[in-house]
């Protein structure tokens, strides 16, 4: 059943947790937990034995804010003894090699676009690591979920998070603690399994490309964006070089892997520099955009 609804043998459910300051969206968020759990599609099995879970030591702001500790549950001592992102990323790459997965034959699954488009892209810039091809096409499970609600019928949902809403819709119990990256991965994996078994077609539905036509238009935004996550998203869409492109279910093909859908160049070339630098935004902001400045975007 599961294999009929997904073209990949292996799905890697991924979640990041980051440093944060709730009162300031212009905060250079760094990864502090990096977790993955595998889902074996042909055998319809969540493979908790195939997992990756590491705490990561931030470099810019080494002391976690109270908001961050309360939100993630990650204690300062776990961060103090962890490796920095460049080391953990190398460990992750070695872990992938041990699994013997062939690029293009597996896909990452997240509960939104935030983990790979925003968090990974920004962290890679801070760590001077090129954004890998396997992070530039992924499955946004929540987007598939919204389509499934249209197909199966809506419900009144009281949850506020993507994971919470999906668990509530499918009557699934919450696993562990919200915003622990590994517990989030296990929740997403359980939701993924339920969705596939109920007939959802699960495949890559978002790509990261170097350009978008709408970014050529002047940006209209709230000048108080630093206090609003939603408003800050508009700023990130202009500052980050790679932008989300949605593709329809079934349109992703293996030959699309590793090639930017916009410029048609390989991902070892595309995205190494910003093709649509928001000069007007930088010029018009009275105060420097801190997260962009500290990462060297301008």
From Swiss-Prot:
Q: Which InterPro entries match?
A: 3-5_Exoribonuclease, ERI-1_3'hExo-like, Exonuclease_RNaseT/DNA_pol3, RNaseH-like_sf, RNaseH_sf
BP terms from Gene Ontology:
apoptotic DNA fragmentation; DNA catabolic process; exonucleolytic trimming to generate mature 3'-end of 5.8S rRNA from tricistronic rRNA transcript (SSU-rRNA, 5.8S rRNA, LSU-rRNA); RNA catabolic process
User: For binding Mg(2+), which residues are annotated in this chain's numbering?
Assistant: 15, 17, 184
Q: Identify which top EC class this enzyme belongs to.
A: hydrolase
The terms under GO molecular function for this entry are: 3'-5' exonuclease activity; 3'-5'-RNA exonuclease activity; DNA endonuclease activity; DNA nuclease activity; metal ion binding; RNA nuclease activity; single-stranded DNA binding
**Cofactor(s) required, per the database record:** Mg(2+)
Q: What is the recorded phenotype of mutating residue 15 to A?
A: Reduces DNase activity. Abolishes DNase activity
Q: Which CDD domains match?
A: ERI-1_3'hExo_like (cd06133)
Chain residues that bind Zn(2+)? 210, 260, 263, 270
The record's cofactor note says: Probably binds Mg(2+) in vivo, Mn(2+) ions are found in the crystal structure.
**Function, as annotated:** Possesses 3'->5' exoribonuclease activity in digestion of DNA and RNA. Cleaves nucleic acid substrates with efficiencies in the following order: single-stranded RNA (ssRNA) > double-stranded DNA (dsDNA) > single-stranded DNA (ssDNA). Involved in apoptotic DNA degradation.
| Full protein name | 3'-5' exonuclease crn-4
**What gene does the UniProt entry assign to this protein?**
crn-4
């Amino acid at each position: 059943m599961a294999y009929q609804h997904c073209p990949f043998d292996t799905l890697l459910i991924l979640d990041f947790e980051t440093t944060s300051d709730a009162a300031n969206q212009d905060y250079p968020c760094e990864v502090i937990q990096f977790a993955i759990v595998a889902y074996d599609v042909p055998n319809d099995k969540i493979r908790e034995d195939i997992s990756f879970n590491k705490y990561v030591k931030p470099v810019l702001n080494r002391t976690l804010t109270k908001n961050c500790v309360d939100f993630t549950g990650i204690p300062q001592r776990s961060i103090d003894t962890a490796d920095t992102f460049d080391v953990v990323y190398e460990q992750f790459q070695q872990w992938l090699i041990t699994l013997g997965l062939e690029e293009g034959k597996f896909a990452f699954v997240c509960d939104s676009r935030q983990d790979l488009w925003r968090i990974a892209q920004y962290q890679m810039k801070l760590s001077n690591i090129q954004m890998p091809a396997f992070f530039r096409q992924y499955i946004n499970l929540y987007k598939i979920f919204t389509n499934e609600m249209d197909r199966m019928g809506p419900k009144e949902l009281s949850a506020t998070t993507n994971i919470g809403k999906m668990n509530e819709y499918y009557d699934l119990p919450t696993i562990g603690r919200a915003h622990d990256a590994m517990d989030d991965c296990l929740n997403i994996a359980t939701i993924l399994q339920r969705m596939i078994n109920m007939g959802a077609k699960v495949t890559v539905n978002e790509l990261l490309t170097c350009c978008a036509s709408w970014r050529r238009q002047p940006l209209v935004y709230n000048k108080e964006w630093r206090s609003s996550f939603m408003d800050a998203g508009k700023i990130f869409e202009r500052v980050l070089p790679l932008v989300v492109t949605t593709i329809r279910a079934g349109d992703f093909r293996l030959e699309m892997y590793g090639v930017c859908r916009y410029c048609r160049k390989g991902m070892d070339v595309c995205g190494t520099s910003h093709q649509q630098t928001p000069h007007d935004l930088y010029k018009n902001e009275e105060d420097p955009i801190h997260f962009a400045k500290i990462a060297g975007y301008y």
